């Protein structure tokens, strides 16, 4: 399995293979997830003091805050996967 990395803003990089969800931080359930992750010590704040625009949830139960829009992170994730899929179909 190939390791794919994705930039989540300000030079912060996350393993794309570990991402389960990329969501907006506006809803009450997501705010609750952020609070619970902070209490458990599983919160990673990659916003550099800026407003949180995306919440990334990983398969290891880490919650990552990013200052980049969820759509932007998702677009970067999809554009990383597209070349790999093209290589696989060529084989």
Curated annotation (Swiss-Prot):
Coiled-coil residues: none
Q: Which family does it belong to?
A: Belongs to the RemA family.
Q: Which HAMAP family does the record match to this protein?
A: RemA
Put simply, this protein is called: Putative regulatory protein PTH_1796
Q: Organism source for this protein?
A: Pelotomaculum thermopropionicum (strain DSM 13744 / JCM 10971 / SI)
